[in-house]
Regions:
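Juxtamembrane intracellular "pre-TM" segments in multi-pass secondary transporters
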Residues: 2-4, 192-225, 251
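Extracytoplasmic gate region of multi-pass secondary transporters
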Residues: 29-30, 220-276, 331, 335, ...
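Extracellular/periplasmic helix-loop-helix junction of adjacent transmembrane segments
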Residues: 32-62
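Conserved MFS/SLC helix-loop-helix module at the cytosolic interface between two early adjacent transmembrane helices
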Residues: 62-98
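Helix-breaking motifs and short loop linkers at transmembrane-helix boundaries and internal kinks
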Residues: 75, 96-102, 130, 314-315
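Structural signature of the two symmetry-related core transmembrane helices
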Residues: 78-92, 292-308
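Cytoplasmic helix-loop-helix junction between adjacent transmembrane helices
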Residues: 106-144
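Helix-loop-helix hairpin linking two adjacent transmembrane segments in secondary transporters
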Residues: 141, 145-190
């Protein structure tokens, strides 16, 4: 199992499913407003539904750097397992929610637990894949996010056939069961265990404090430029991903059971295409110009601007779907170059 040539890809395969569950569980709520508002009347207000989506993102954003600090200091296998188990349990419990406040707090807990996953998973993959396979391994893992986003769109379809409560229950049970699979087969990289022990054995006066590290980070002007660079497209990006099912249903006059899968598959497939195109283009451009990745990312970001306008003003199937495809390709091109730019 732990063959040095095979097991690194077993890790990618195991975590690919976790990545799928990560985006599936967070995305499915955006398609289930229609089914849920019959029982939870507060969801008839767009402001209340928006608050559910926003609390997750706020907590996810604030927890991400904390998650990175934790991942550097503990066994990442158990962090991944614990993260998956908690957010899957939260998904299961959402099926028992009887009012808006219960949903709100469960969504907040999901933000904490899901934020712990990505830093741990990416660093775990990076440690198991040294050299030429690292970028490919990370890229394969990221495709799990797009597939999960697409599958999450079927939450509305499942809710229409069964019930929204049963949909949350079964999606949660799948994640809880898979966390048990990870306990058996996912392994921490031995190098990381050695590094953690060295940190633990380092005299306290020689250990860099978290506060000093954050102080150094926040006083670096380059950090703020990068922060704005990531934040600017995230505002329309997450608004689009969270509200696109509703927009499709309203603009095209189709039931949410159809609008959910159509919208999420449109974004997921086009984003995947954008990632591939953006990666190929930037890899070639950077060989001729050191700013090639930055320019490629800027092109992708620029494509999202007309797409957002078309999404807002379009009322025909072709215009709305076309705008969704354009947005996904542009965001995928932008997304493909984020991490390489940082590295």
């Amino acid at each position: 199992m732990k063959n040095k040539n095979i097991y690194p890809w077993v890790v990618v395969g195991l975590l690919w499913i976790v990545a799928l569950l990560n985006y599936m569980d967070r995305q499915m709520l955006s398609t289930m407003q229609e089914a849920m508002k019959v029982d939870i009347v507060e969801l008839n207000k767009a402001e209340a539904f928006g608050a559910l989506m926003a609390i997750f993102l706020w907590i996810y954003g604030f927890m991400s750097p904390v998650a990175g600090i934790i991942a550097d200091r503990v066994n990442r296998k158990w962090l991944v397992v614990g993260s998956l188990f908690v957010w899957s349990a939260v998904t299961f419990l959402m099926g028992y929610a009887q009012d808006f406040h219960e949903l709100y707090w469960l969504r907040a807990i999901m933000g904490i637990s899901e934020a712990l996953y990505i830093p741990s998973a990416l660093s775990l993959i990076a440690d198991w894949h040294e050299g030429k396979s690292r970028s490919l391994a990370v890229g394969v893992h990221m495709t799990g996010l797009y597939v999960g986003q697409a599958i999450g769109g079927f939450g509305a379809t499942a809710a229409a056939v069964f019930s929204w409560q049963s949909t949350f229950h079964w999606f949660g049970i799948v994640g809880i069961a898979y966390s048990l699979v990870l306990i058996l087969f996912l392994k921490e990289n031995p190098i990381h265990n050695i590094a953690v022990k060295e940190i633990d054995n380092t005299p306290k006066e020689k250990k860099p404090s978290v506060i000093s590290g954050l102080s150094l980070l926040f006083t670096n002007w380059a950090f703020w430029i990068i922060l704005i660079y990531f934040a600017a497209p995230s505002l329309p990006g997450w608004a689009t991903k969270n509200w696109l099912p509703t927009l499709f249903a309203d603009s095209l006059n189709i039931p949410m059971a159809e609008a959910g899968p159509i919208s999420t598959i449109t974004i997921a497939v086009s984003s995947f295409i954008g990632v591939i195109l953006g990666g190929i283009l930037s890899d070639r451009w950077v060989q001729k110009n050191i700013r090639g990745r930055i320019y490629t990312g800027a092109i992708g970001l620029g494509m999202t601007i007309p797409a957002l306008l078309l999404l807002g003003f379009g009322h025909s199937f072709i215009s709305v779907i076309g705008a969704g495809l354009l947005f996904g390709i542009g965001f995928g091109i932008f997304d493909a170059n984020n991490m390489p730019i940082l590295c």
